[in-house]
Regions:
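Cytoplasmic coupling helices
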Residues: 85-96, 100, 170-215, 272, ...
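An intracellular "coupling" helix at the cytosolic face of ABC transporter transmembrane type-1 domains
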Residues: 122, 195-205, 209-254, 258, ...
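Hydrophobic alpha-helical membrane-associated segments
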Residues: 20-32, 36, 70-87, 173-188, ...
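Alpha-helical transmembrane segments of polytopic integral membrane proteins
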Residues: 33, 37-41, 95-99, 141-144, ...
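Helix-loop-helix
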Residues: 149-176, 240-308
Length: 333
């Protein structure tokens, strides 16, 4: 899965060169995020005391924001385009790495067409998406943790009174607690996703055979039996996703108001300005969202685990991990 793209001569430039380009664009986005966070303080302090400032100061603030936001939008759009292209190249590398092995074996491999066509595509897309988020989360943590650490001096939190960087620790503890609960709530999802692909593959196989032979295949009793298996598994899957979604939505909504609950009393006591509150809540959101990356992507990670399991079994079945790349009938993309 990784070797076909990152360790082959044909794709090495795409894999590593593209990775460097993506890292560079993420660094630029993170730098702009930090500048926007700094902008919050001055602009919201301006809004808090409008009678003490001139309207020209307001428009200067808007213009400063636009100078940051417009490049951000352009970089973000170009990055998304390039990463989609990057994921497709990865899929292409995996597809043409598997094909010669599959053609050389005599035994039938269950769901081989789905593994090569669908699972390769989804694996590349999900790994690209989550990998991108992981790298960006690390950059945001490096950039915003010192900012939030410094801003924590403006608040006093029960149980964290004598601890430096209290807001950072609150974010970390909340994220770890949320991750543990998410793991418990979603513990059955990977197995259900795997079973779902098994029953879907059996149903799809029957339909494919039925395209050429409708006498011996796609008979009503067989279709009913296969679809009943699909329905049973989907109902279980929907149920488990239902209470997992309930937990994740509840968790995220609570975390939206946490910084305001913590800092609100200080604002009304006059120990901080509105600008500091907004800047701190923004930094808290960035740090917490980075810590909570795996919670917010749990369903995609579940799907990825299922795909990885199927592709690993497929690689073993076709001998991809056991023998050297066959030369006979090898394909070129």
């Amino acid at each position: 899965m990784l070797k076909s793209f990152f360790l082959t001569k044909k794709w090495r430039l795409w894999a590593w060169g593209g990775f460097v380009i993506i890292i560079g664009s993420l660094l630029a986005q993170t730098w702009i995020d930090v500048k926007i966070n700094e902008w919050y303080k001055g602009f919201y302090d301006l809004l808090q005391k409008p009678t003490e400032n001139d309207i020209s100061d307001f428009w200067d603030g808007i213009f400063t924001f636009l100078k940051l936001a417009i490049p951000y939008v352009i970089i973000y759009t170009l990055t998304n385009y390039f990463t989609r292209l990057y994921a497709f190249r990865w899929r292409e590398a995996m597809t043409f790495a598997y094909m010669p092995y599959w053609k050389e074996i005599d035994a039938k491999v269950e769901g081989a067409s789905q593994r090569i066509q669908e699972d390769c595509m989804n694996f590349a897309k999900i790994v690209e998406s989550i990998g991108l988020q992981v790298v960006r989360a690390i950059m945001l943590l490096i950039a915003f943790t010192p900012i939030l650490w410094g801003l924590s001096s403006n608040v006093v939190i029960p149980f964290f009174k004598d601890i430096s960087g209290s807001l950072v620790w609150v974010s970390l503890v909340a994220s770890l607690g949320g991750l543990i609960i998410s793991w418990i709530v979603g513990i059955k999802l990977p197995g259900l996703e795997y079973n779902n692909q098994v029953v879907e593959a059996a149903f799809r196989k029957e339909l494919v055979y039925g395209e050429d032979d409708r006498i011996n295949y796609v008979q009503p009793p067989t279709i009913l039996e296969l679809f009943s298996g699909i329905k049973f598994n989907y109902h279980r899957l929907f149920l488990h996703y239902g209470y997992f979604d309930l937990w994740v939505i509840l968790y995220n909504q609570i975390m939206v108001i946490v910084p305001y609950i913590i800092m609100g009393p200080g604002l009304f006591a006059g120990s901080m300005t509105l600008g500091i509150l907004i800047q701190t809540s923004s930094a808290f959101r960035e740090v917490h969202s980075s810590f909570s990356l795996f919670i917010n992507n749990w369903t995609r990670i579940t799907e990825l685990r299922s795909i990885f399991r199927r592709l690993s079994e497929f690689e073993i079945a076709i001998g991809y991990k056991k023998i050297k790349r066959p030369k006979v009938g090898a394909l070129r993309s």
